[in-house]
């Protein structure tokens, strides 16, 4: 299964979500394709001791070859950069699941609408899911996001991933949320995203 974490806006937490989500799968072969020009996941994986297979295809053809090699029972998570490009569009078009991280701010909604336009241009057969990500712990009202998503053929996940220091700290140390003690709620949030995507069966 190919899961693409996508948004044309940078700073929405795509790489952080992709990294922790990749470590949530049990008894699965998991690889990451890092298309972000910042190469965040590539370098975090080096710090971790190369615990995952992180690839950086340099062309559309190379990317497609990697995606076509993904077995049905394996997991491939694609972290696209915060910009529009041919290689990012190819990743989206070859996905089984597209996950769009978004926060509650009005600027995020505007960025979401821009990305929505790109999706309409592409031939996308994948399920498209929106996840409230990097959300302030006290925020409860998501009406703006719900309204934006309701106008599209997308599903807003019930799981809300809150802004948590441990997500960033663990990642910065080359670790992940499932390797640290405690922080049960943070772990449940990542598992909630995984389970709602129905890709650990």
In which residue ranges do the predicted regions lie?
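Structural beta-sheet core signal
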Residues: 32, 78, 100, 130-132
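Inter-motif core of Ras-like GTPase G domains
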Residues: 86-105
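Inter-lobe coupling/hinge region of RecA-like P-loop helicase motors
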Residues: 168-187, 191-194
């Amino acid at each position: 299964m190919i899961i693409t974490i996508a948004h044309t806006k940078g700073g929405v937490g795509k790489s952080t979500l992709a990294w922790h989500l990749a470590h949530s799968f049990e008894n699965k072969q998991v690889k990451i394709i890092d298309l972000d020009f910042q190469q965040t996941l590539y370098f975090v994986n080096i710090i971790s001791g190369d615990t995952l297979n992180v690839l950086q295809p340099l062309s559309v053809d190379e990317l497609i070859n990697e995606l076509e090699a993904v077995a049905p029972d394996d997991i491939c998570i694609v972290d696209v950069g915060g910009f529009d490009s041919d290689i990012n569009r190819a990743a989206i078009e070859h996905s089984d699941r597209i996950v769009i991280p978004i926060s509650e701010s009005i600027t995020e909604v505007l960025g979401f609408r821009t990305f929505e336009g790109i999706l309409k241009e592409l031939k996308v057969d994948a399920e498209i899911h929106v996840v409230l990500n990097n959300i302030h712990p006290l925020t409860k009202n998501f009406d703006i996001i719900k309204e934006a998503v309701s106008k599209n053929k997308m599903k807003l996940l019930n799981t809300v991933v809150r802004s948590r220091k441990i997500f960033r700290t663990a990642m910065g140390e080359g670790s992940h949320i499932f390797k640290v003690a405690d922080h049960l709620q943070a772990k449940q949030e990542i598992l909630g995203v995984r389970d709602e995507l129905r890709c650990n069966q």
